[in-house]
Swiss-Prot record:
The keyword rRNA-binding applies. InterPro entries: KOW, Rib_uL2_dom2, Ribosomal_uL24, Ribosomal_uL24_CS, Ribosomal_uL24_KOW, Translation_prot_SH3-like_sf. Keywords: Ribonucleoprotein, Ribosomal protein, RNA-binding, rRNA-binding. Coiled coil: none annotated. It comes from Pseudomonas syringae pv. tomato (strain ATCC BAA-871 / DC3000). HAMAP family: Ribosomal_uL24_B. Part of the 50S ribosomal subunit. GO terms for molecular function: rRNA binding; structural constituent of ribosome. The keyword Ribosomal protein applies. One of its GO terms (biological process) is translation. Signal peptide: none annotated. This is Large ribosomal subunit protein uL24. It comes from the Bacteria. The lineage of its organism: Bacteria, Pseudomonadati, Pseudomonadota, Gammaproteobacteria, Pseudomonadales. One of its GO terms (cellular component) is ribonucleoprotein complex.
Length: 104
């Protein structure tokens, strides 16, 4: 079970976007995350009239490592760590500071 999943709200704790919050769009296999509006890079694209792609400079999200982000706890309004607990025979994710379920 992953500590950070798609659609979780996270806060960046290290790097050029430190302090920014965003929603996880994609979780990649090598402990990297794509987060909406964070770690934006510019890519130069060639126009392709066959597929209708207009050329130019495109800004898009680049993946960042999971160690540079923390899950955001809305109850405490701070970054938090994730732990696991077994409740009713199911393994659930909980915030370490409040012991409340992440998906609640």
């Amino acid at each position: 079970m992953q500590k950070i999943r798609r659609d979780d709200e996270i806060i960046v704790i290290a790097g050029k976007d430190k302090g920014k919050r965003g929603k996880v769009l994609k979780v990649l296999a090598d402990d990297r995350l794509v987060v909406g509006g964070i770690n934006l890079v510019k890519r130069h694209t060639k126009p392709n009239p066959m597929s209708g792609v207009q050329g130019g400079i495109v800004e898009k999200e680049a993946p960042l490592h999971a160690s540079n982000v923390a899950i955001f706890n809305g109850a405490t309004n701070k970054a938090d760590r994730v732990g696991f607990k077994v409740e009713d025979g199911k393994k659930i994710r909980v915030f370490k500071s409040t012991q409340k379920a992440v998906d609640a």
